[in-house]
Amino acid sequence: MNTTFEKTRLGICLVLAMSFVTAGSVASSDRTLLLADDPAKGGSTHHATRRDAMITALASANPNPSMGDEAQTFDRLVGTWDAEFTFQRDDGTVSQKKGELLFGWTMDGHAIQDLWIGYPTEPQKERSIGTTIRFFDTTLKQWRVVFINPQFNYVVSAQGGREGDRIVLRGVDTDGLPIRWIFSEMKPDSFHWQGEKSHDGGKTWKLEEDHHMKRRL
């Protein structure tokens, strides 16, 4: 793996880790601290170092060697993806927006994190942002996943893994109904993501989210 790609992976991890610290935005007082590497601007090097330390410690350039071949389940998604998001509501209406999706390793390579960013559309003024942490449970022999979106007070968990040429994760939504997330058509420069929900205990599934990703980095 060349040096340029390694630096790209690490940079992505730092961006993902920063989502925990900033939650997508930084107050004006904090912005001053983040720029504090220049004392001439009235900053303090102590503050900048304190904030950067957590980000640096959390990010990992590669999966932990202890994960073995299981790391390849999600390692192929590491990078930055341009996203075309499609949402299908219960009333039959469909909404679309553009955004991006970033993947990178964290926690000494024992977990992989992603960051979902939806660009704002009128009349919205703020981007939507959510993040997922995944790790392979060596007892269950499955990937365990937690997704959070603070803007909507939304937290949901799922678990699963590779099923043929797809990745399928199953869980329960906040309304108590079964959900499944499917990664498919996975190629080096593109993949397809679908979010489905069942209203009959898993007998049939309704498509709620249908997203297409193309690799940027």
Residue ranges and their predicted role:
Residues 57-59, 64-66, 71, 82-182:
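Central antiparallel beta-sheet cores of small beta-barrel/beta-sandwich binding domains
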Residues 196-199:
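Conserved Ser/Thr-centered positions that define the repeating blades of beta-propeller domains
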Residues 107, 187-189, 217:
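Residue-level recognition of beta-strand termini and adjacent short loop/turns
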Residues 2-14, 24-94, 217:
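Amphipathic/hydrophobic helical signal segments and adjacent flexible N-terminal regions
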Residues 17-19:
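Hydrophobic membrane-insertion alpha-helices, especially the h-region
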Residues 212-214:
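Short beta-strand edge segments in extracellular beta-sheet folds
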